């Protein structure tokens, strides 16, 4: 069986702290997988890393056969890798355009509309 999502040695470091330390994960296509652990264990950081909201320090992630390491969050969403959030918020490290694209339905039409909107408000 092929895997829809795989990570190999995925590491996220904040300062000197490894929030995720060389995580290997394989999710078979068509299967559900739960990620459980105590507060502060790195579950949300891991999800943020594979969806592109925090940069990885090492390792790689492959979704549906393609390396997603260089993709922006909205590009990962367009490929089908999406998530829900614990709270509604803007992402301070993303531009206004990228924040809008994260929320947009994954089509070129919405990218076009977001570009038009941002040009109208001069952002």
Which residues does each predicted region cover?
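Short coil-to-beta microelement around the adenine-binding A-loop and adjacent beta1/P-loop entry
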Residues: 17-18, 75
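The feature captures the beta-strand-to-loop junction immediately N-terminal to the Walker
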Residues: 36-38
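Helix-to-loop junction immediately C-terminal to a conserved catalytic motif
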Residues: 51
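Conserved ABC transporter NBD signature motif
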Residues: 59-67, 79
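Short coil-to-helix segment of the ABC ATPase nucleotide-binding domain corresponding to the Q-loop/switch region
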Residues: 94-116
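Conserved small/polar residues in nucleotide/adenosyl-binding loops
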Residues: 121-123
């Amino acid at each position: 069986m092929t895997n829809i999502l795989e990570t190999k040695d995925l590491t996220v470091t904040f300062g000197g702290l490894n929030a995720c330390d060389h995580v290997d994960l394989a999710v078979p296509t068509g299967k559900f997988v739960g990620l459980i652990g105590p507060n502060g264990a790195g579950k949300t950081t891991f999800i943020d890393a594979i969806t592109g909201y925090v940069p990885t320090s090492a390792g790689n992630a492959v979704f549906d056969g393609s390396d997603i390491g260089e993709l922006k969050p909205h590009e990962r969403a367009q490929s089908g890798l999406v998530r829900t959030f614990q709270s509604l918020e803007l992402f301070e490290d993303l531009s206004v355009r990228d924040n809008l694209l994260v929320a947009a339905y994954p089509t070129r039409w919405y990218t076009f509309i977001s570009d038009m909107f941002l040009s109208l408000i001069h952002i």
